[in-house]
């Protein structure tokens, strides 16, 4: 058996355009924007161009819009793209909103997708400090749970796992059953 020191559920909302994102975080029906510590975006100038992808974090719990905006060093250059998709993520349990845990999740996400993330250069060699497992849940902008066959060129695994022996595992649940 393997010892998993940290297990987190991340709830992702998206895909959103930039206007939808701004409207979503300001919405009165939205969970508190300060709960969102993670963001992922992908963009391409047009259908002939390759996708550019970036995953990032906002360690302060003062609203994701303070980080993911037109002044962002990577995001700003893609605002004029024809295809721009944004996902924002929060811990399912807000007690996990601590800087070290946010950073650990970011490192796992970057390691899992480093070959597809074109804009994450600094953290590609950095590993989580201990074993960690992430369960991703996907929601649309109305906060309805989505099935797991969602069109995403990247970043679509339900489970991500890192073991201290430099073992990475990732994948999707083959079948999700809803007991309604």
Enumerate the predicted regions with their spans.
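Boundary/linker segments flanking structured domains
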Residues: 1-53, 57-180
């Amino acid at each position: 058996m393997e010892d998993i020191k940290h297990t987190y559920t991340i709830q992702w909302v998206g895909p959103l355009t930039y206007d939808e994102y701004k409207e979503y975080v300001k919405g009165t029906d939205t969970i508190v924007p300060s709960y969102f510590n993670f963001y992922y975006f992908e963009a391409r100038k047009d259908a002939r161009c390759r996708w550019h992808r970036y995953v990032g974090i906002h360690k302060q719990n003062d609203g994701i819009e303070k980080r993911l905006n037109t002044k962002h060093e990577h995001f700003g250059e893609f605002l004029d793209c024809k295809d721009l998709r944004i996902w924002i993520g929060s811990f399912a349990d807000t007690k996990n909103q601590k800087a070290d845990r946010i950073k650990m999740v970011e490192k796992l996400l970057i390691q899992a997708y480093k070959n597809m993330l074109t804009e994450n250069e600094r953290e590609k060699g950095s590993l989580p400090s201990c074993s960690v497992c992430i369960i991703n849940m996907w929601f649309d902008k109305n906060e309805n749970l989505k099935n797991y066959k969602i069109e995403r060129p990247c970043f679509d695994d339900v489970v991500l796992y890192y073991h201290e022996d430099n073992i990475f595992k990732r994948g999707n649940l083959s079948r999700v059953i809803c007991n309604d």
